[in-house]
Amino acid sequence: MFDHISIQVASFAKTLSFYTAALARLGYVPQYVDDTAKSAGFGPEGDVRLWIAEGKPAAKVHLALRSPSREAVGAFHTAALRAGGKDNGKPGLRPDYHASYYAAFVFDPDGNNLEAVTHEAE
C-alpha cells in the first residue's frame, strides 16, 4: 500500500485549480498549499495522499482514486471537464475489469490519466 504519490506539473496554478475542482467530489481537498514552492498536497481531511509540484513533468501517469459511490464518480467527471480536463471515458461500468468496476477517466492539464473508481455493486 502506498503512502502518497507526487507528480510534477507544468503549471502549478492551472493544475491546482483543476485538481481542487475535480478531486473535491472524491473527498480529496487541498491540505497544504505553498505558492512560493509551487506545491500542494491533496487528500481526505488530515491525510495528504497526492502531491503536485511545478517542474518538468515526467512520463504521463495513470492515477486511479477510490470513489465513495457511483454518484461521486459522475460528479468527479463533470467537475473535471468543467475545470478544463479532457474526457477519456465517461462514467460507466467496465465489465472487462470486473462486473462492478464503475469508473470515469479524464486527462488533467498535463495529459495524465486521472480515474475515479468504485468497486461497489449497485
Language-model segments: residues:
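Glycine-rich acetyl-CoA-binding "A-motif" of GNAT/NAT acetyltransferases
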Residues: 113
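Vicinal oxygen chelate
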Residues: 11-13, 65-110
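Short glycine-enriched loop/turn motifs at secondary-structure junctions
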Residues: 1, 56-59, 98
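N-terminal beta-strand motif that seeds the catalytic metal site of vicinal oxygen chelate
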Residues: 1-16, 63, 120-122
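Long, continuous compositionally biased terminal/linker segments
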Residues: 38-82
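Core segments of cupin and vicinal oxygen chelate
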Residues: 6-48
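Short glycine-/small-residue motifs
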Residues: 116
